[in-house]
Every structure is written in C-alpha cells, then in structure tokens.
Amino acid sequence: MSENIRESISAKTLSKDQMETSYVSLKTWIEDSLDLFKNDLLPLLYPLFIHIYFDLIQQNKTDEAKEFFEKYRGDHYNKSEEIKQFESIYTVQHIHENNFAYTFKNSKYHLSMGRYAFDLLINFLEERNLTYILKILNQHLDIKVYVGPKSEERPQGIETSVVDAEIDLTTFLVSRECEDAILGDEQYRYDHLETYVLQLRKQREMKPKDSVYKPNASQIHAEIEKLKDLCKRVAVNKNNLPSICCYTIHNTYEGLTAAEISNDLKLMACGFKDSYVEVYSLTNESLKKLKSSSELAKSDIKTLNEEKFEEVGSSYKLVGHSGPVYGLKFFSSNKFLVSSSQDCTVCLWSLDLLCLLAVYKAHAFPVWCVDVAPNDYFFASGAGDRQAIVWSVMTSKPERLIISSLSDVTAVKFHPNSSYLFTGSSDHRVRMHDISTASVVRIFCGHTDTVTCMDVSHCGKFLASGSKDRTVLLWDIQSSKLLGKYVGHENTVFSVSFCFYGSVLASCGADNSVRLWDRTDHKGGCLGTYYTKNTPLLCVKFGYRNIISCTGPFIS
C-alpha cells in the first residue's frame, strides 16, 4: 500500500459499538460518494466486514460478533458463497480449522483503486480519526493505486501465490498407435486420411512425447472415426458460424440435474434427482446391449459377431446411485460412462453391458463434477470436501488427492495431453495441477463467483471458464494471463466448448441461450445469440465436424 497510510494501531481494545461505528461511518461515506469513485471504494467494505467479525471473535465476544455479522451480511449479497462459509465460525479455533477463513485472515486481500479515490479515502479516515480501519487496511489489504483509466483487470480477493512452474503443453490429436494403424492399413492407402495422418506424424516427430498408457483396440477405433469426422469438418469463423442442434428433454418435472453429450455427438446421458442415469441414442440406431453368456452359448459360432448384441430401444436407465446425479462424462471410446452424485460416490458404467461396473468411494461430501482424461485411463471428480481426486480405471483407490481449493470443487477438466488437471471452485479460482505430482502449476484469478464449467482448446494452449458471475473468461495457459472477458449471459453459464481448428467458442446457460464468441476478439464481442423457448441449457459441445449440439429440460 502507499506510504501515505501511516501505521496507527490503537493501544486499547475497541468495543463492538466502536468497531461497528467505524464500519458504518465508512460505509455511509462510500454510499454517499460520487458514482465516479463509488465503484472503486465499495469493494473495501467486504474485507473490512470480515476482519471486524474476526476481531470480535478473537476478543471472545461471540454473541456480539454474530449480531454484527447478521446485521450487515446483507450488504455483501454478491459474496453469498463465501458468507455461508463464515456463518458457522464462532471461536478462534473455528478460524484455524476452517481452511478458507484461516487463509482469509492471514493473507492480503487484493484491490485496485484510482489515485483520486484513494486520496479521498485516506483523508476521510484521518479526518475522522478512524485508526482502527487504517490498521486493517495496513495489515490485511493490498491496494494497487492506478492513475488514469484502468489499464488491466486485476483480480480482487485474497492473495494467492504466483505459480510459474515449467509446464509442457505439447498435445497430439490422436495416439501414435492410431497413426500406426492407419498408415499400416491397406484400406487407407492413398486415401485423404493417410495424407492427414502423415501431417500429424510430422508434428509428432518435431515434438516427440509418448504416453506410457497404450490405447486398446476400441480406443484406436474411436480415434480413427474421430479423424474421419475431422477430415469432413466445416470451417467455422466469425463469418461462417456453425449449425446448432438442440435436444429438449420433456416431462422432467424439474428433476433433471445433469446432462452430457458424447464427443462424437452420438450419445447423450442425463442425470436425475431420482438417482438414476438415462442414456439416449442421438442417431437412428438403437442402443445395444451385450447378451448374457448363456444366450451367447446358444448362438451359432458363424453368426456370433452379428448376434452378440440385442437392441434395447432409443434410451436405457442405469440405476445405482442413492442420491441426485450431479456429474456425467463419456469416455472417448463410448464404451464407458462415469457419473457422480450427492451420495458421495463416483460410478463407472459399461455401455456395452448397460450395467454398473464399479463404485469409487473417497469423498466425504456430495460429488459435484467429473471428467475423463483423453487417454481414457484416468478420470477425475470434484466434491464439496474441497478435494479433487484422480482415479484410474484399473483400481478403485485414488491415484491422486488434489487439495488446493479453499471451497467446493465445482468443475474439473483434463488438459488434452492428459498430464494436467484444471479445477474450478466456489472460491472463484481455477487451478492447474500436474497430475504426476498433484502440485499446483498455475492459478487463474478473474471470476467473481463460483466457477461452473471449463474447456481447453484442442491445441492445448487456451482455457475457457464459465461462472455464476455470468461471464466466460479466456486464458492463455502458459502465462496464466486473462486474454478475453465475454459478457452477455443473463444467468449462470453452465457449459463452454471450443471448436476444432477455428476461433469460435460456444457457451450456454440458465438464460435459455447459446452464445457464440470469437476467440481472437479479446474485447468480448458476441457473434450470435440463439434462444430456446423455455429450456435452460446444461451442456453445449462442438462435434468433430464443428456442428454444435446442446441439451436441456423444457420448463413448463
């Protein structure tokens, strides 16, 4: 902070009335100030409010602290998620046991303020002899004073360490095994797919980086189909916007809690408040289920391949959870589906057998989100216990426990090279973790409310995040710098998606709309807005051919 602030610490312990009077005096002055300065000054009140509350608790004035807290918490409705975490704190021990409260108390709170507004603030505090407020400013706030227009957006909030660890964002579209399968197959000889793969192989030789996890036959088949679709993709940009297909789910009776579309846009899964998952076919083909071993034993060996599956219709219910389903994700091979629930578990389902394969237990609170690594070997979950857990399909025990968030982990996303995991939290931050060490390698600060969704560009260089603050933020992963802020949604953003080989970014949310943005336009101009009649959209996804699919429940 500026040297203009002198360190003034009162020698005597202030009473609750004196603390409250100081807070109210400053609050009234800020609310009566000119609009030109009010936006700079208003953010001061929240950290002051919390630190006064903590000071009263440290003086063992529990009743007075709660009275002060309840009286003025309404002034900070935009911080409702954080306020909820503080309302259960009554003693000094609670502060030490609550990770978020302890960090808030012992870290600097960042703010930006214009020079003139800052000078007015200091003059007011000195004229009114508000030395207690000055003490809090000195000890707990870090105010960056700027002159002239605000040159860049500086995140507000508690201090986080600047992480600048070395990271490798090298990303390949498909595995080496998939490339080998295509180049070694006669049916692709002199085909456009062979030419495409030869270009990919040149990129791989320039930056060799092989995964230790080798794909199986079904994964290689899925990657070949992916390349076939990519070869037929539509070029999309601000002058050539993509087509959008919306799937509306009727008669949910407000019971739909999650929805997900597969990467190839052929399957859709919905999670419900009634604890079940329903899988839908988005093509003309029926869902198929592998016959039981007794039925297969009766089949003719010559026709076994054609008869080993039986059709079960266009949808199928999967029952296994004991609470509302909050997260869903398909494996890239479409052979498996992973789901998370309020029952604190993660379930792995087989889409060949259409049954539950495994239940993963380690979380102590509801599991809000899941994601599957592109290599189909790892998947991750985030929960209300502030943990993200990386799991392996080979074992039911956690591979990594990632404990870095100060609040609920509400979104998880793997990097395309499967080496890093991004977590979004109710503490408004996105963190990037190295899976091999579980350490934080990047922190992205910019949202002002809970992070709800993320997506990483297919080149592995850019991150998009959506939030309850109704914005979509675009980040450069290497430098962790904010590239663009896209404003337009009128309610929570539920899903974001990058196109393939283009600059278009799609988002959808609770305002019943899909919005398209230009990734290269960092000023945040919207390319197009498409409204549904009355359907909040839970998922939006670019397919391999750059056609968008989205889904949500019809609210009658």
Curated annotation (Swiss-Prot):
Cross-referenced Pfam families: TFIID_NTD2, WD40
Gene3D superfamilies in the record: TFIID subunit TAF5, NTD2 domain, YVTN repeat-like/Quinoprotein amine dehydrogenase
Family: Belongs to the WD repeat TAF5 family.
Gene Ontology molecular function terms on file: RNA polymerase II general transcription initiation factor activity
Cited InterPro entries: G-protein_beta_WD-40_rep, TFIID_NTD2, TFIID_NTD2_sf, WD40/YVTN_repeat-like_dom_sf, WD40_repeat_CS, WD40_repeat_dom_sf, WD40_rpt
Subunit structure: Component of the TFIID and SAGA complexes. TFIID is composed of TATA binding protein (TBP) and a number of TBP-associated factors (TAFs).
Protein name (record): Transcription initiation factor TFIID subunit 5
Gene Ontology cellular component terms for the protein in this record: transcription factor TFIID complex
WD repeats by residue range: 251-291, 320-359, 362-401, 404-443, 446-485, 488-527
Coiled coil (residue ranges): none
Superkingdom classification of source: Eukaryota
Annotated compartments: Nucleus
Entry keyword Transferase: no
Tagged with keyword Transcription: yes
Biological processes annotated in GO: transcription initiation at RNA polymerase II promoter
